[in-house]
Amino acid sequence: MRLGNLQLDHPLFLAPMSGITDYPFRQLAREMGCGLVFTEMVSAEGLIRKGEAFLKIKKDEHPVSVQLFGSNPEVIAEAAQMAEAMGADAIDFNMGCPAKQLVEAGAGVDLMRFPEKVKEILTMVRRKVKSPLTIKIRSGWDSKNINAVEISKIAEDCGIDAISIHPRTKDQGFRGRADWKLIGEVKKAVRIPVVGNGDVTQPSLAKEMLEETGCDGVMIGRGALGNPWIFGFKNSGRWEEKPATPPLGEKQRMIHYHFLLVQAHWGEKGAVKTFRKHIYWYTKGLPGCSSFHSKLSGIREKEALFEAIHSYFDFVQKGNQCQSFGSAKNRSVTG
């Protein structure tokens, strides 16, 4: 897949997620086969004020796209130019986030209500940057205002290189099912690449989205949490057939490796604090996970964290289905 002058090896992308897609997570996604990673959402105004203190791109994390959000055309254009100068391989502009604070500020999905402003912003940004420029949108504001096709055509006319669409409305948030049919409608309406997003939780669903909608790529967000195996597309160009749920031993090994990546970036104390949420996602749905998650909340040291992880996986592997993790009957296991 090609974005402007950027050739990508694989059609699976890691979606930008606030508080999640930091450097270690992007690194892991790339190692697992992800074709393009995105930074966490970056405030255009914040980037202009704080520069490198607000955004750092490492030499070994290419290709990477910086996703910006904002509502002021001049500010967004200046921030895009800065991100490009700082090493971004592509710039993405967020018009899909339904978060209350963004919407109230006239940013994110709120912009889809104002097509003329969208045109103004994209035209100005396109004039400022030479790198591939993409946008992230939703279906529209609500069920009575589905305008993804209209916004996509405007973007194409402004010289945007690709469009990512999450086919839910602002009102839906993340409820209900993503309307994949709308991805296909957008694809038919424009000539630039279209990337689908929404409800992809395993490699087979990514393949299904590509085939069903005709889209050029698949952006994966929540489906990658605790599940880096989802980027199951390899250099051979064939989809790798893997079980939907990796073996327990593989999960435990991945947790350890992922933690080391986080520790190398944030330091040991920062890693313990930052990594707990990832452990929740890796172990979600396993027997006794609720009790295990409760125990994690009080852990502050690396040694205690790994002791708890080891004890928990030992508990699960022994098949203690009828006991809760940490109960009296398995206290010898948990220490």
Model region roles, listed by residue range:
Residues 64-133, 138-145, 155-156:
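Active-site beta->alpha loop and helix N-cap motifs at the rims of alpha/beta catalytic domains
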Residues 100-117, 171-180, 239-244:
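Glycine-rich tight-turn/loop motif centered on a GG-T
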Residues 39, 90-98, 157-167, 219-224:
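Non-cysteine beta-strand/loop elements that form the S-adenosyl-L-methionine
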Residues 1-13, 45-63, 97, 102-105, ...:
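N-terminal small/glycine-rich loop or linker at the start of catalytic domains
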Residues 12-16, 37-39, 64-68, 91, ...:
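Hydrophobic faces of well-ordered beta-strands that scaffold small-molecule active sites
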Residues 2, 17-89:
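Glycine-rich, positively charged N-terminal anion/phosphate-binding segment
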Residues 17-19, 42-44, 69-71, 96-98, ...:
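Active-site beta-loop-alpha junctions enriched in small/polar residues
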Residues 8, 18, 23-24, 120-123, ...:
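Alpha/beta catalytic cores of nucleotide-metabolism and tRNA/nucleoside-modifying enzymes
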